[in-house]
Structure formats: C-alpha cells, structure tokens
Regions:
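Short, flexible loop segments at the rims of nucleotide/cofactor-binding pockets, characterized by
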Residues: 57, 136-141, 179-182
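ATP/nucleoside-binding phosphotransfer catalytic cores, i.e., glycine-rich phosphate-binding loops
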Residues: 148-217
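A glycine-rich beta-strand to alpha-helix segment
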Residues: 74-98
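Short, conserved loop/helix-junction motifs that constitute active-site signature segments
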Residues: 2-11, 51, 152-156, 194-198
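Class I SAM-dependent methyltransferase SAM-binding "motif I" and its flanking Rossmann-like core
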Residues: 90-142
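Ligand-binding beta-strand-loop-alpha-helix segment within the catalytic cores
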Residues: 4-80, 140
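A short secondary-structure junction signal
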Residues: 69, 89-104, 171-175, 214-215
Length: 217
C-alpha cells in the first residue's frame, strides 16, 4: 500500500472476531487481542494519508449492534480467513452436542442463519490458539469470543481461505476442500457450509500441505 501509494480512504475493514471475557470484549491490553494485532501488524504500518479512516474500521464488540449495522450499504469484496483444527472460519465452531443437538447437529440452514454473536469456544480451538499464539499457555485463552457469523459471511462477494499448514492439519485441509467441492454441507464441519456460498477460494502453501500418511513417533 505504501510503496504503490494506494489510497484506502474509501475502504472498509471488518475484524472477524475478538475475545470475550467478564461480560465484555477484551481490551487491546490483552496479549491476544485481535484488534491490537490488526492495528499493529497492518493499519499502524500504513502511511496516515493512505490508511482507512477510523470510522471505517469495524471491530466486533460485546454489543454487536453497530458492527452488524456497519455491513449495510457497503460492498464487502472479500472475506479473508483461515481454517482451524475444529474446521471453523472465524470462531464459527461446531455447536455443543446437547439438548436439541444431542443426537444431530443443527441443519446447515439453521447454522447459516446465525449472525455475529458471542460464542462458547470448542476445547480444540482453545488448545489451538494456545499453541499458535500463546506459547502453549491455554489458561491465557478466553473461553468465549465474539465472531462474525454466516449471515455476514454470505454478504461477502468472495470468501478466501488461506491454508498455510499452521492452523490445520493435512487431513483437515483436504477434508473441507473435498466437502465443499462435492457440495456436502454439515454443521459438524462448519467450513463445509461454504459449499453453498457462490464464490469460495482456497489457497494452499505447498510446504504446509503435509501428508496424510500414518507414522508412529
């Protein structure tokens, strides 16, 4: 952006998620704050005369009203994300299998009706974020988060998923590509619900694709 002098004055950015703790979104003082990372790793590095105005940066808050309304009347060209071990995008984790979902997960239609919301995080997600971002300290990772939902995801013209081999394993990277390409949508594998989105692109880092061969260590 700086080198090519691309003005982002008319651009909008939506953060996909933020940690939720003690009834509120975490502050940027939290070491794992997504807003802090977005600002320090991206926007603070863009020349001030080129970066988007503050009012065009939308970060999820405990009260999701303003965040959800910010999607109205604005074109979201691309939603850029990744895939977690639990097969989520953002923090759209599989729902807890209890109550009405004890025997069957919610239908794809029911899951796709979800909007930006506060969610309970799957234990696999907690472990993954401790491993990839917290130096292995799982007690640092909040057990809830605010996440962009399928409703907003379907407002994006394209959903782009980078598979770098860091956040999911060799089987998982292949599984969701197979399910999406075959039109198999199952909310137990949330990423597979993108089978019904009109424009999904997976980009793989070959060095991180790995092998599904079985080997004991």
């Amino acid at each position: 952006v700086n080198e090519l002098e691309i003005s982002l004055k008319d651009a909008h950015f939506w953060g996909m998620d933020e940690w939720y703790e003690d009834g509120s979104e975490v502050s940027m003082e939290h070491p794992l704050s997504f807003e802090k990372a977005d600002r320090e790793l991206c926007f603070d590095r863009i020349r001030e005369d080129l970066r988007p105005p503050e009012q065009n940066l939308h970060f999820p808050k405990a009260d999701v009203t303003a965040y959800r309304e910010s999607w109205n009347g604005v074109r979201c060209v691309v939603m850029q994300g990744g895939q977690g071990d639990v097969k989520h995008w953002a923090f759209n984790d599989p729902l807890r299998r209890e109550g009405a979902y004890a025997d069957e997960p919610p239908s794809p239609e029911e899951y796709r009706s979800l909007a930006t919301r506060v969610v309970e995080l799957h234990p696999i997600t907690l472990s993954q974020n401790a491993r990839t971002s917290g130096g292995g300290n799982v007690t640092m990772v909040p057990q809830q988060a605010i996440t962009v939902g399928p409703q907003e995801t379907w407002q994006a013209e394209r959903v782009s998923i980078w598979q770098a081999g860091t956040h999911d394993n060799p089987l998982g990277q292949r599984l969701t590509a197979l399910m999406i390409s075959k039109g198999v949508a199952d909310s137990a594998v949330p990423m597979s619900l993108l089978a019904d989105h009109p424009n999904v692109r997976f980009s793989y880092y070959l060095g991180g694709l790995g092998s599904c061969s079985v080997e004991m260590h």
